[in-house]
Each structure stands twice: as structure tokens, then as C-alpha cells.
């Protein structure tokens, strides 16, 4: 009799545990589906650890986006990964440059410009490589990303120095953090960087050979999808994004870049002492479409590729 009671108790425990395990699986599955639905409905914004994204980071951290609207940041370290996310509709908004966007549009991706940004790019030479002028890039390695503003800038450098294109070895390094690390480790002769990575390079006494600002090129942009964005819910999200972005730009311009050093350090992973290398006059403009002449430059360069 006692043996029978033990068997019944053990069976009860097994059945109970089985039900508990199945119930846990069901709850976890339901939670995952709920999270996926919420993420799908949210406005997902792809960003990089670069200074042009500062208004977005500020709006997120300081709750300048309407809290009634679900806006989520998706962090990337390479522009190509943002391109893939945009092409696969895994994000609705992304930070990019005109060359990359015009190429995506040429390939059939349905994108529209939300705004230009204050991003600028610099061609920086490794001080140990003794590259004092663009002509010294002959037989040197240049880190960049193909079909981007960095690729365009590489061509401009080669053409202006009257070098043979095949004599400058373009090395595709997509991750902006890896690109800077290669300079710090003396693994690359020259690189094309934006802020704040360029500021780190300047602090380390590496030489700037080319700057898009001096070429009157404003190539940074933020884009959104065309398809699936015509509903009222998406329109409301974009309006909230625009208002939050504009507020963030106004705040940075009012208080100054130094006031947000901790935010830059948090998202861009650079030490704040490098920020002293960035001009105090740097401003962030409100939402405004890119200039037609800059779009034309991107299209003209792509037409030759």
C-alpha cells in the first residue's frame, strides 16, 4: 500500500512538473510574440556611434520624443548594416549619407529624405606613415567603405593629387570603431573618418589632408522608408520624431557640445578629452532637406561606377 502511495505521489509530481514546463513555454512564447508585435509597430531608428546622431541620442535619453509614441533606437557600428536593415524593412528610419542612399534608391529601395545632417568627413593620414600631402598616398592603404561618401572622397583625393587609382589601395573597413582602432594600432596608412572618431585622430596628432567642409559638401542625411509609412500611426511617429529631433538640436546649440560630453562618451565610445578637438562653433540644424547640389554630386559620382 505504501509503495502504491509513493508511486502515485511521484506520478503527480511528474505530471505537475510537465504541466508547469509546458505552461512556462506557452507564456514565454506569448511574451516573445507580444514583444515582436510591439517592436514591429514601433518606429525603429538605425543609428551609428557618430556625432551626427547626437540629436537622436539626446532626444532618446532626455525623453524629448513624445512618450505616447514608441520610438526605438537600433544601434549599429557600420553603415552597410544600416543599409541592410533599411532594405529588409527592419527599421523605418536610418542615418546615412547621400551616396549610399542614392545607390539604394538606384537599386530599387523606396526611401525618402527626412533631413540633412551636419556630418562631415576628413581624410586623415597616419603620422607614422609620413604622408604629408595627398600625393604621398601613392602605394599606401586607405581605409574606407565602398559606395559611400568615403569612397567618393577617396576618388577626389586620388584625382586632385593626379595619382593612378590602382596605386592607392582602398581597404574596405566598414565598422567605424574598427577603422579608428586600426589607426591607433598603426595598421593603416590613411583613413576617412567622421566625428568624433576624427577628433580622436587629431588629438593623436595625425594629419588631416582633406575635409568635406572645405569642399562645400554636405553629405550626411537621415532617411525613412516610403512603403508602409502612409498610415496615421506612422505619420504620428514621424511627427514625434521631427519634434524631438528639433528640440534636441535647439538644446545642443543653446548649451553647447561640451554640455553633452557624457552622452557622446556613452554612445560614441570615445573619451571626452578628444571633444576639445571639435570646433565650439559646430551647430546642429533643425529638420531640413539636403541641398540639390549635394544630391547631384552623389548621383554624378555613382553614374561613373
Report residues per predicted region.
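An extracytoplasmic/periplasmic, membrane-proximal ligand-sensing/linker region
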Residues: 20-31, 35-43, 51, 190, ...
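Second-shell loop/turn segments in exported
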Residues: 43-45, 139-144, 227-234, 246-253, ...
Amino acid at each position: 500500500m505504501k509503495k502504491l502511495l509513493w508511486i502515485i505521489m511521484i506520478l503527480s509530481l511528474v505530471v505537475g512538473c510537465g504541466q508547469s514546463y509546458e505552461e512556462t513555454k506557452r507564456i514565454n512564447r506569448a511574451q516573445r510574440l507580444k514583444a515582436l508585435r510591439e517592436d514591429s509597430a514601433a518606429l525603429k531608428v538605425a543609428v551609428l556611434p557618430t556625432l551626427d546622431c547626437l540629436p537622436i541620442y539626446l532626444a532618446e535619453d532626455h525623453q524629448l520624443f513624445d512618450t505616447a509614441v514608441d520610438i526605438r533606437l537600433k544601434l549599429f557600428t557600420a553603415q552597410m548594416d544600416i543599409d541592410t536593415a533599411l532594405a529588409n524593412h527592419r527599421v523605418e528610419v536610418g542615418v546615412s549619407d547621400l551616396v549610399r542612399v542614392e545607390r539604394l534608391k538606384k537599386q530599387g529601395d523606396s526611401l525618402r529624405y527626412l533631413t540633412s545632417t551636419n556630418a562631415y568627413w576628413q581624410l586623415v593620414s597616419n603620422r607614422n606613415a609620413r604622408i604629408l600631402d595627398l600625393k604621398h598616398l601613392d602605394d599606401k592603404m586607405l581605409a574606407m567603405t565602398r559606395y559611400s561618401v568615403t569612397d567618393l572622397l577617396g576618388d577626389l583625393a586620388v584625382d586632385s593629387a593626379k595619382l593612378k587609382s590602382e596605386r592607392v589601395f582602398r581597404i574596405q573597413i566598414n565598422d567605424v570603431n574598427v577603422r579608428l582602432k586600426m589607426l591607433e594600432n598603426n595598421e593603416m596608412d590613411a583613413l576617412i573618418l567622421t566625428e568624433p572618431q576624427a577628433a580622436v585622430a587629431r588629438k593623436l596628432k595625425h594629419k588631416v589632408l582633406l575635409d568635406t567642409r572645405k569642399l562645400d559638401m554636405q553629405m550626411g542625411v537621415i532617411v525613412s522608408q516610403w512603403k508602409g509609412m502612409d498610415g496615421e500611426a506612422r505619420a504620428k511617429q514621424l511627427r514625434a520624431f521631427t519634434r524631438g529631433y528639433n528640440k534636441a538640436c535647439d538644446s545642443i546649440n543653446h548649451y553647447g557640445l561640451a554640455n553633452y560630453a557624457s552622452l557622446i562618451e556613452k554612445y560614441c565610445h570615445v573619451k571626452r578629452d578628444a571633444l576639445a578637438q571639435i570646433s565650439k562653433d559646430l551647430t546642429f540644424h533643425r529638420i531640413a532637406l539636403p541641398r540639390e547640389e549635394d544630391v547631384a554630386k552623389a548621383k554624378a559620382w555613382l553614374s561613373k561606377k
